[in-house]
Design a protein with these regions (language model features):
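Short, hinge-like loop/turn segments at secondary-structure boundaries
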Residues: 57-61, 85-87, 125-129, 196-198, ...
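Conserved acidic, metal-coordinating active-site core of Asp-based
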Residues: 100, 104-217
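Mg2+-dependent phosphoryl-transfer enzymes with acidic/Ser/Thr/Gly-rich catalytic loops
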Residues: 2-6, 23, 188-272
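Residue-level signal for inorganic ion chemistry
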Residues: 33, 72, 153, 227, ...
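Structural detector of well-ordered beta-strand residues that form the stable sheet scaffold
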Residues: 41, 69, 109, 180, ...
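Short, structured coil segments at secondary-structure junctions
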Residues: 58, 64, 72, 172-175, ...
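Asp-based phosphoryl-transfer active-site loop
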Residues: 3-18
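Active-site phosphate-binding/coordination module
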Residues: 24-124
Length: 272
């Protein structure tokens, strides 16, 4: 078996079932890994505030020696909330993205820690339906300021018009920012070189763990970087094709069939 010291887990479509549950088998498997001293790190696009329930389910909430990577790698923090590393947008970045989404007739939400600033637009954002635990504040763009922290931006919109609009994004923006879909109806905008792999690289440097000792599990485009980077990259059976293409392992089952539990049992817990 690989000498895995850290397991990085995406949430939606990976660790969680479609109805957003952690099954008993999955929780037991993660506990068995933690009992062996293996770090279990939720690695997500969400802010820490939206993770409280799941960290509580895992028994790692509020712990000084447990860690979470949020905002797709933009924030590396202890589960106490203490920040180890942070990369954010400038106000000018948000202004440029707002200009682009207005041109494409798309909504844009700017996220500042646990608060989502929903910039008023002709198109309604669907982001509140994805993360009801967050605080949503409707604003005009003029209400935003350079004194605010902007962790990332999102565009949550109906899949068909969103996919069509993505094809029209100004090409230079792909050189300036990280732009990727994390769900069918969710496009994420992050600072350049902020993705899950960079967040994990910063965390393992802090912990003294080698890249080869990391197992990463995911299913969507925002998981691709960490699955390609990790010593053991695991794609769910339900993963998008580009993620499966870079994975070391593709599970024979989906997230609804406890694929993460299977992968940990097979590649971490199983005795030789």
């Amino acid at each position: 078996m690989a000498d895995i010291k850290l397991i990085a887990l995406d949430l939606d479509g990976t660790l969680l079932t479609t109805d957003k549950r952690l099954t008993d088998r999955t929780k037991a498997t993660l506990k068995a890994a933690r009992d062996r001293g293996i770090k279990v790190v939720l690695t997500t696009g969400r802010p820490l505030k939206a993770m409280d329930f799941f960290l509580h389910e895992l028994g790692t909430d509020g712990q000084d020696d447990e860690y979470t990577i949020t905002f797709n790698g933009g924030l590396v923090q202890k589960n106490t909330g203490e920040i180890l590393d942070k990369t954010v947008f400038s106000y000018d970045d948000v202004a440029r993205l707002y200009e682009e989404t207005e041109k494409l007739s798309l909504p844009l939400d700017a996220i500042s820690e646990g608060t989502v600033y929903q910039i008023q637009s002709d198109q309604e954002s669907l982001y509140a339906k994805f993360n009801p635990a967050l605080t949503f504040v409707p604003v005009d763009f003029a209400d935003l300021s350079s004194q605010m922290t902007y962790n990332k931006c999102v565009t949550a919109f109906a899949q068909e018009p969103l996919d069509a609009a993505i094809q029209k994004i100004s090409p230079e923006l792909f050189d300036q920012y990280e732009i990727f879909k994390s769900r069918e109806m969710l496009l994420e905008w992050s600072p350049k070189n902020v993705h899950k792999a960079t967040g994990l690289a910063k965390l393992i440097s802090h912990l003294g763990i080698d890249q080869s000792q990391v197992m990463a599990c995911g299913d969507e485009a925002n998981d691709l970087s960490m699955i390609e980077w990790a010593g053991l990259g695991v794609a769910m059976q339900n993963a998008v094709p580009e993620v499966k293409a870079v994975a070391n392992v593709v599970t024979p089952m989906t997230n609804d069939e406890e694929a993460v539990a299977w992968a940990i049992e097979e590649y971490v817990l199983k005795e030789n």
